[in-house]
Amino acid sequence: MIFIIIFGEKMINNLHKYILPFVLVSLGSNMFAQDNKANQNDVEEVVVVGSQIKGASISGALPVSVLSSEDIEALGVDSGDELLAQIAENGANYYNEQDWNGGVNGARGDVGSFNIRNLGTGNTLALINGRRLVQNPSYQTELIGGSYVPVMSVNSNNIPIGGVDRVEILKDGASAIYGADAVAGVVNTVLKKEFEGFNIKARLAAYDHFSTEDNKVSIEFGTDLNDGRTNLGIFFDYYDRGEINANEDPRWADGDWAYKNLDLGPFQGSFRNSSNQGIFGKFYTYGTKKKAWSFYPAGAGKCNQSSAIDLGAAGCLEDSTSSTDRPRTNLNEDRAVRSQLERVNFFVYLNHEMQDGSELFTEIGAYSADSGPRNLYQQSTLGASSTCTSNIQAMIIPAENFYNPLDSDLCKDDYRFPNKPISSTALNTYRLLQGVRGSYDNGWDYEAAFVWSKAYSRNVVENRIGMDLLALALADQTAAAFNPFHGGVVPSNIERTWVDVYRKNETDLLMIDFKLTNNDLFELPGGSAGMLLGYEYREESFADMRDPRLNGTISWTNPWGETYPFVSAVANSSPTPNSSGEREVTSIFAELQMPVMDNLDIQLALRHEDFSDISETATVGKFAFGWQLHEKLLFRGSYQTAFRAPNLVTVFESVVARNNTRSDSLGRYVGDGSDIKDPNDPDTTLFDISRSVQRVARGSADLQPEESTNYSVGFVIDPIENLTIIIDKWEIEKEKSIGLFGEVNHTTLDLLMRLQGGASECVGNPAVERSPADPATAPFFAAAGLCNAGEVIRINDIYTNLDTRIIGGTDLAILYDFYTNFGDFGIKYQHSRTDEFSQTAGGNAATIVSASEAGLLPGIAVQGFSDLIGVDGNFEDKSVITAFWDYKAYRISYSSTEVGEFEESGIRRSDGTKWIIPSMQTQNITFSYNFDIADNPARLRFAVRNLEDKRAPLADETYGYYSKTHSDYGRNYYLELRVKL
């Protein structure tokens, strides 16, 4: 019973799977017929991520980048996401605190994602000490194909920076070595071991432009016990980061950059991220679009019109849709760009050598982070439109409302609630590993380990609007009713509608593995061949638990009868059911390393994986070679296949509706790129071509795994002593990428089908649901030769396997160390260039691409199926430089990171003019001095980060910069003291 309580009934039922590897250890002893107790040799761990064979000679020929602890200190990073940003091969960070486009569906809090090769979140395998990390508990969506698809990643901030010995990046993938899903590569964080001593490190950071301070305390403790047979190590990091508010920076503070800049040329109309929705809204007489009323502040010119209705100090209602005198809402005001954060990373290892020479090793890790409270922007309801009946969350103000000045029901259009929600997020991750390693007398080594890890997240947003409570407050005929016409100067009574909305997530990882290795299996002309045989079993699961007003437990029905699962009871949030799922993966794998000649090493690897939730199995392989053509020239290459099963969310998620503002290609075609206006009243819109559209998608067990090939070929050149030059050409070709056709593409297909059918084709694409056609728009559609149609209400899409995605490029690294009477010098330059990144169109995507190329869809762009290189964070170039000078008690370190330019496609002009976000380089310099404090070695360090005070280039984003690739905090400093006790 105790075991069932601790481990769960499922684990007990599968106990044979967990025991099997340890049984194999015993069988191995009998198989080799050796006395393991007689072997007192030291046990050696695997130290190279490119091969799991100890002492493998092929390891030097594999494309592995390494960031040492000295490199990491020179970079001065405080967290895992900052560390990944300094890796040349890592791309955009889609899990970042400044990107809140996903709302409650985003991965909030102290999160960062792995994205080697910029292939996308979820394509990189993250390890710690050679074994998997649990996925971040909350997930979000990323654009794949034509719309947004759920993606999962390990949280990079789980990495205990203070205990890191080095970070290894295996760039040619490693599916056959570590897991079939290692498509883009592997990031292995190796923590310090066999540590002795007691170090305390304290850091204080400050900024040129902001009043906040960051504080960090790190403790390292290690000691030998049991006459040196046991080593205990403890690493502890505490990080306290202050909030930075948007009001502290002029660019962040106001989202409307259009009026501030006179040099934007053809982009003058862009960069306006304020909103025409505000507390002064626009209202329509319910049931018709013929009568429109706008709410203006007191003193506005419209209030002098004879048709204006005086609302006293709050303002007036006037018979117009004009927004000329209505103030726009600055969504950035009093928002935190960076929230208050407290983070703790804790890691313990215990290594113990047994009497028989084997070693027990234990790892215990814990991570916690509390961020917030953080103000969000003022919110509205979903589906604002002049067509009230097409609004998912229509806000109807009954005629009986105490504050309604008219004798009819009103439907709101451009309106935001006066309050700002407040978000707080707590993250926790725990990890336990227990393993044993040893050696047999005949040269075989064994290692087995059990890993359990669990991650939790809880996000709570206060002061959200409950739609059920809002309906009651609007229907109130007393002075306690909600007053939409408050104008910010009289009470609104909005508090009666407030609710707290939560999202709770969990992920689990349970894994057990067993490996046998022998680096002296048989002799070849070049030396001894090595081999690894292994078995791995793992269970992964996730649970996404939503607030009752989001998951349908508390429902709300809109005025035309729609309810859950298409409508939620929280304003401005789409409905989301609770979801959960689990997967069991069983793997067997082998690796063979053969020095076939003195100057030629070959690596062969094979891995087979079986999945419990999909019908297909995976067999992937790898071939790599290192050919020493000359003592100063190594020619190397590799080819491997990978197999990435659909992530758990895309398999187990049920019906999920999401509202996003999207362009309707049909309306764009009929309106010649503009909204269709009433010819008798230009202020009245008959057909919105860009509006809030609901997309309904669902998980599918029929999804096929993504399959990919990864190859690299290159040279390692050592022209002179201590100088190494590395050049690698690489390419990844991935088939069956999981994505969505997308809302805009569905409307484009709808347009194409109607064009092909002519005026008699009134159905079009069945995936597109439209409101009843307005007779007033019939002449416009007839002029275009099309059947009259209404605005888009809903688009039904499913996760599907798309066609081929290809990415490729070149890596360059130059490493040089030299030693003089004036000190030791070292420099490392790494550059990663992406030459190709494209998503091939297939199926319906190919149909609309062909039609576009034939000129049948003028002015209509196909979304997500094209050349992706140099677009929206997919930069072509990234360079990282680290350098140092050591002389006696002094050390100076330098680092530089440069991210190349790319286009922001969302504001591309109709004539093809592009907005290019230029490259950005930041430089850091660190000064260190070693001395003694009461006979205890100490080090004082002063660092200047972003030496030239570079600010991120302008982008049409929330805070005016592209946060997925750039930081915009400017120059900052830290002072650090380390004492060895």
Set out the residue ranges of the language-model regions.
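N-terminal Sec signal peptide and the immediately downstream disordered periplasmic leader
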Residues: 2-88, 117, 156-159, 218, ...
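Periplasmic N-terminal accessory/gating domains of Gram-negative outer-membrane beta-barrel systems
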Residues: 62-115, 120-122, 131-156, 168-175
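Predominantly transmembrane beta-strands of Gram-negative outer membrane beta-barrel pores used
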Residues: 83, 125, 186-192, 199-206, ...
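A beta-strand signature from Gram-negative outer-membrane beta-barrel systems
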Residues: 124, 128, 132-133, 148-203, ...
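Surface-exposed, low-complexity loop segments enriched in small/polar and acidic residues
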Residues: 138, 251-257, 300-341, 347-351, ...
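Short loop/turn motifs that connect adjacent beta-strands in outer-membrane beta-barrel proteins
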Residues: 159, 194-197, 226-229, 355-358, ...
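C-terminal beta-barrel architecture of Gram-negative outer-membrane proteins
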Residues: 658, 823-932, 948
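C-terminal beta-signal and adjacent terminal beta-strands/loops
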Residues: 724, 735, 835-838, 895-907, ...
